[in-house]
A protein has these predicted regions:
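A generic "binding-loop/recognition-motif" signal
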Residues: 47, 55-56, 75, 91-92, ...
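Short acidic-glycine-tyrosine-enriched beta hairpin
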Residues: 73-89
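Conserved short histidine dyad/triad with adjacent acidic residue
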Residues: 24-26, 38-54, 89
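A short hydrophobic beta-strand segment most commonly corresponding to one strand
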Residues: 41, 59, 86, 101-116
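Short, charged/polar surface micro-motifs in flexible loops or helix N-caps
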Residues: 31-34, 43-48, 64-67, 111-115
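Glycine- and acidic-residue-biased ligand/ion/polar-headgroup-sensing regions
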Residues: 55-67
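A short, N-terminal "cap"/entry segment at the start of jelly-roll beta-barrel domains
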Residues: 1-35, 50, 116-117
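Short beta-strand His + acidic residue motifs that chelate non-heme Fe in jelly-roll/DSBH
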Residues: 49-51, 69-70, 87, 93-100
Length: 117
């Protein structure tokens, strides 16, 4: 078993994100998890991620606050604490914190090809 204490979690930069800080909780350099990695993202008010899609699916779990997910189809969904969603590979989405409080969420993703530990 490998434990990552929050005080030991390492920061990483997520491309196309703004006014947000991320910590690696599992996978990559945080642990030997071989099937997925887990990040903790803290979005400041007004923070978010640009509309983008990726080659891998991802799961979001909101821990605190609210996160608005805008899809390229025009759909908008507001996720609250303990709400979760699955974004399929190739599905474009934007994320934003439209509130005046910090929003925190877990991100769970498989490794890109040849990137597993």
């Amino acid at each position: 078993m490998q434990i990552t204490r929050i005080d030991d979690a390492q920061r990483y930069d997520a491309p196309k994100h703004f006014d947000m800080r991320s910590l690696r909780l599992q996978g990559f350099s945080a642990s030997k998890a071989d099937f997925a990695w887990v990040g903790l993202s803290h979005f400041l008010p007004g923070g978010g991620a640009e509309m983008d899609s990726g080659p891998l699916g991802k799961i979001y779990v909101v821990l605190e606050g609210e996160v608005t997910v805008d899809l390229a189809t025009g759909e908008t969904h507001v996720l609250h604490a303990l709400d979760s969603c699955f974004i399929a590979a190739g599905e474009a989405r934007a994320i934003r914190n439209a509130s005046n409080a910090v929003a925190s969420m877990l991100v769970v993703m498989p490794y890109p090809p040849k990137a597993s530990p």
